[in-house]
């Protein structure tokens, strides 16, 4: 009897923890250097400002640009010269700057006319944006027009209400006004005897004054009795 064959699996190498630690050590050993804060603007902004302020018809040379940076920003041009050359090349390729003389990073540079036109056009755009905001003030007028429409719509309603009330008032007041008219007509015949009082006033009572004179005339003939003296 032959013994059955036994399968043997190969042993898998296990990474020791010491090796893993060795791999992490170099990462922790490298100290991070603190980045020094910038004391100036980016090179692109400084170069563009230099070309704008110099305003040379034939373009500003690299030397003129460097002198401007030293005077304006007080920068070490020797350290920034490679960055200046890189920006000039990329700016010419992108169309941000025009190279009037030389090739590559040497020669003269100026701003393209399209960039100047865009800057000039941007200013009126800002003014045009502000004007519609001021012109938007007439919006309250629309609200006023709505108010006028509402008031006009309400006026006919009030007119119809008054028209309905007027005939009702006329029908009720007419019989009431007729009653006092009859009452006033009754006292008119009572006023007729008033002329009688006027006739009494016209009687000339004072004209009867001559009656007082009659007794004076009657007394005079009584004095004629004097002839009685003849008897003596």
UniProtKB/Swiss-Prot annotation:
Keyword Hydrolase attached: no
InterPro entries in alphabetical order: H1/H5, Histone_H1/H5_H15, WH-like_DNA-bd_sf, WH_DNA-bd_sf
Q: Name one GO biological process term.
A: nucleosome assembly
Q: Which domain of life is it from?
A: Eukaryota
Which molecular function GO terms apply here?
DNA binding; structural constituent of chromatin
Q: From the UniProt entry, list the residue stretches annotated as the region Disordered.
A: 1-42, 98-232
Q: Which GO terms describe its cellular component?
A: nucleosome; nucleus
Its main subcellular localisation, reduced to a broad class, is nucleus
In this chain, composition skew of type Low complexity spans: 1-18
Parts of the chain that traverse the membrane: none
- Key words of the record: Chromosome, DNA-binding, Nucleus
Family membership, please give it: Belongs to the histone H1/H5 family.
* Described function: Histones H1 are necessary for the condensation of nucleosome chains into higher-order structures.
Q: What is this protein called?
A: Histone H1A
Q: Which organism is it from?
A: Chironomus tentans (Midge)
Lineage of the organism: Eukaryota, Metazoa, Ecdysozoa, Arthropoda, Hexapoda
């Amino acid at each position: 009897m032959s013994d059955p064959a036994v399968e043997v699996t190969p042993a898998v190498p296990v990474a020791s923890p010491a090796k893993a630690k060795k791999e992490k050590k170099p990462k922790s050993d490298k100290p991070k250097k603190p980045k020094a804060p910038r004391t100036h603007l980016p090179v692109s902004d400084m170069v563009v400002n230099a070309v704008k302020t110099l305003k040379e018809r034939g373009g500003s040379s690299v030397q003129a640009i460097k002198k401007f940076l030293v005077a304006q920003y007080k920068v070490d041009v020797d350290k920034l010269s490679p960055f200046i050359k890189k920006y000039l090349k990329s700016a010419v390729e992108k169309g941000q700057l025009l190279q009037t003389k030389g090739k590559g990073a040497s020669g003269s540079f100026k701003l393209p006319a399209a960039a100047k036109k865009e800057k000039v056009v941007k200013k009126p755009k800002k003014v045009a944006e502000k004007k519609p905001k001021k012109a938007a003030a007439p919006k309250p007028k629309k609200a006023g027009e709505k108010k006028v429409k509402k008031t006009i719509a309400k006026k006919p309603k009030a007119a119809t209400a008054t028209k309905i009330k007027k005939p009702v008032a006329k029908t009720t007041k007419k019989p009431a006004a007729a009653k006092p008219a009859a009452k006033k007509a009754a006292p008119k015949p009572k006023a007729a005897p008033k002329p009688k009082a006027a006739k009494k006033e016209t009687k000339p009572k004072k004209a009867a004054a001559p009656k007082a004179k009659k007794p004076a005339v009657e007394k005079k003939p009584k004095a004629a009795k004097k002839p009685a003296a003849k008897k003596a």
